């Protein structure tokens, strides 16, 4: 171990903790804005802006990673389109359905929201875990990218703001909001730590991914058993936030399954780096 490596291992954790000094206040500010001005989230503008920014970041990151792969320009372009077109169509279908109210309880007989949550994961996870091409892309991509991207999870603080206003039941809003905020707060510090390339950093990132997945498991379970529908077991004093309405329904219908797949990709990438 060189002096430079030791220096990097020492500096990275410090930078990670310093990142919390600006992420945490901004998260508190976002929560306060949604508490005092609930119309911000209800307008759909933050959701639309965030979704488009994430979509752009994923498309650029994928292209950058593909440029590092040993592929011809045509194969690189086709692979990029082969991933981004289905991903964009998925977003468009969910977005269009949400705007038109198809996820509202009683609109259709099928449990569309649970289907929207689980079906993409059931189909996508095996493909992402087994595809050799995806493995090549992950090998070419810095491990920091997939982790840092989930900084957007701090926007889950809207659940906490809704609970504080009395607009969402605590049995759902508290675990969902707290879990999302913790995952988002530590995304950048974990990513900074990963930049050192150490085994300890990869272990921390693996634990972070598992926590993020556990957060979704709890949030989805609590959301299903407290929301109107065939899976409801608990009837809270108020409906779960949004009750299938746009824009909030975009969180379980798209953000949750897409974030689960990002966790799956990150875990596969970390495993490949550890085995290398």
Show the residue positions of the predicted features.
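Loop-to-helix transition at the N-terminal end of transmembrane alpha-helices
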Residues: 40-58, 74-84, 108-115
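Transmembrane alpha-helix entry/boundary detector in multi-pass membrane proteins
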Residues: 167-181
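Juxtamembrane non-transmembrane "cap" segments at the membrane-aqueous interface
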Residues: 213-235
């Amino acid at each position: 171990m060189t002096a430079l490596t030791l220096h990097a291992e020492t500096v990275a954790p410090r930078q990670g903790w310093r990142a919390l000094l600006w992420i945490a206040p901004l998260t508190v500010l976002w929560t306060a804005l949604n508490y005092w001005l609930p119309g911000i989230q209800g307008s759909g503008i933050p959701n639309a802006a965030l979704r488009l920014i994430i979509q752009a970041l994923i498309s650029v990151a994928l292209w950058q990673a593909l440029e590092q792969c040993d592929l011809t320009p045509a194969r690189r372009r086709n692979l990029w389109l082969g991933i981004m077109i289905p991903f964009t169509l998925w977003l468009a279908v969910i977005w269009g359905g949400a705007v038109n109210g198809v996820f509202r309880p009683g609109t259709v007989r099928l449990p569309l929201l649970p289907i929207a949550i689980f079906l993409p994961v059931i189909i996508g996870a095996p493909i992402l875990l087994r595809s050799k091409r995806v493995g090549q892309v992950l090998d070419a991509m810095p491990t920091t990218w997939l982790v840092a991207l989930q900084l957007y999870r701090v926007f889950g603080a809207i659940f906490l703001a809704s609970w504080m206003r009395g607009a969402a039941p605590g049995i759902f809003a508290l675990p969902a909001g707290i879990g999302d905020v913790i995952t988002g707060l530590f995304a950048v510090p974990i990513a900074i730590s990963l930049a050192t390339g150490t085994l300890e950093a990869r272990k921390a990132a693996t634990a972070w991914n598992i926590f993020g997945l556990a957060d979704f498991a709890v949030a989805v379970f609590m959301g299903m058993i407290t929301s109107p529908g065939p899976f409801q077991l608990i009837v809270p004093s108020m409906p779960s936030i949004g009750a299938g309405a746009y824009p909030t329904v975009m969180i379980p219908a798209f953000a949750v399954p897409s974030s689960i797949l990002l966790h799956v990709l990150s875990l596969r990438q970390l495993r490949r780096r550890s085995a290398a």
